[in-house]
Amino acid sequence: MKKPIRNRWIVSKKLRIILWVAIVLAVYMLANTSYLLLNRFADMANLDFFAAGKTSIPILFQVMILSHTGVGILLVILMLVFGILHLPKVWKLYQNKSGLSGIAYVIIGLTLGITGLFILTSAASRENNWAWWLHVICAILAPAGYIVHRISSRGNKPSKVSYKKFGTAIAGLLVVFIVWHSLTNRDVIMTEEAQLAMEQGLHEGPGAKNRDVSLFIEDEFVPVGFVPTESPFFPSAATTTTGGYLPSRIITRNDLGSQEKIKEEIDQYGFVKETAIGATTCNRCHQDIVAQWETSAHRFASFNNPFYEATITDMRDHATEPNMWVQKHVAQYKDFGEDGIGRAKSKWCSGCHDPALMLAGKMNKPIDRNTAEAQAGLTCLSCHAIDKIHNLTGNGNYNIADEQEDPYLFATAKDGSIGAYLHDAAIKAKPDVHKQQMLKPFFRESEYCMTCHKVSLNETFNNYRWLRGQNEYDNWHDSGVALNASRTFYLPPFKRECQFCHMPPEEAVLGDIAAKNGMVKSHRFIAVNTALPYLRKDTSTINRIVKFLQDDKLRVDVFAVSTESHPEPMMALNKGDLTLKAGEQITADVVVRNKGVGHTFPGGTNDSNEGWLEFTVKNEAGTTLAISGFIDEKGHLDKNAHAFKAVIVDKNSNPIHKRNAQDIHVVVYANVIGPGTADIAHYTFMLPEE
């Protein structure tokens, strides 16, 4: 039987063009893939001279990643076109190994394309890393499959010269990539502002990350937390890596929204409520986290918080009593003008409340509350750009890494644009640098929260002396919650950081790419602040706060009862047999136990935060016989209520009612419940004769 006669090439001229284009693209893809694998190996082996790095990512590397995607998609399309046009024809002639290997090759190519596209989607989370491994395996099988297919083709076997040319082209292109990468790979690509600051030596100055504060004090003794008056941020303890003011885009990421929309919201609500200043770009990948943050007290920390705005405005206008430190600072920075004492003192608060304003040098001048920076609150980068906590004194004692911005291509592209898509694709393909910038190991520790939730007031601020302000950190640290106090009634099974309670796992219903097992760390920062959500009519957040507080935080028990006829207190009332007689005086001991609050209850600024007991005695008909802790018709609390709060006064014994911290002189009393401890209230009342 005669063998079928056929040409060396069974493909048409048009298909041959497609094939040659595919081969050229395959050469590029193999060189590209080899380059990317070399980078990965360099990362794993810590070969810093070649690795893409942890803090910066070369432009060439990003181009290679993005072109890997683009060329890969094109190659899969060409392969499909070629297969659809080629396979039916050859299948009729040769139903042998050649045909089967061709089908297998098409399947591998399709899998390669599908997994590659999947990796680019928001579903490409850590739980779905199987897609990456399948993509890698198919990438190895694809060239091998093509070679097997060509070898199994009877008359179309490639020559040794073809192999040599193919291999030489790949190797040559790879060498070009390696040399190019080696010449352009740099550690950190700094902003223009950072380069200028470095040239001026500000990075070694009083406002810098690595400042030596001993150079700015004449005394040999340097107090912990000392802030030089020469610092541009004085009296705030905050610093920047460059040592000077930063462009506000470092904090807002230039996600400023529409100025017209901002003005409309301020006119309607009194503050910006809907525009997510500083979070629009982040929202493209972190939808759940941004949605949570939008409802948080952190977001409403600056001039978008009416309570804080009133306080800081009053301070800037009326805290004008000078002292030698503030005077020296104001004299050095001329933009304060002649009436800058109050504005200078306000920076004590601004390190934690107004970073978008203060770090950009805008607190020195009158504030336009209609600007995006004034309405930004604590943006994503207000926290995630922190790369160092200087010490444990609090007062915003952090450093903002402002020497570089988003190092990925098309970082400034607008939402919905091709540039934005390519930018996000580059991050997803190589997220290491993004993670290194945005997530430091200490973010999981209580010391991270401490920098703003531990406060002291000193003479530079209050013209008086050092005073302790709110201090959640020390209360937590010295308790059983941190496993540092054995005398605590209630010890948790393990050390609980701040984040355990205030950033619990929450289901990522919007598909946040940071989700692990479908959960993200909640960025609602739920605590007890119901005032801000009440202003916004945010009932959902109020309900979450109520649920949070009712989750075994406190336990209230009528612990003991004594009467005139039985003066010895009877405890364990559920097991006792006590009869109360009409006309008799009764004393009830009510115990409040702090079981689930990791610091004092209440926490925060206890001159304004207040809890109380409501104790009511009713008869069988439901008639109230005695009550303590009621709210009167004017909305005021019963003056005789057993309250948990602090009473603080100024030098004239006037209560501190306006959050005017600069006027605090002494604490009259502070009735709070420490973590794992208890408080007791005694209630005495007369039962009526009838």
What are the roles of these predicted feature ranges?
Residues K2-P223, E230, T239:
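Membrane-embedded alpha-helical bundles that constitute the cytochrome b-like, heme-associated redox core
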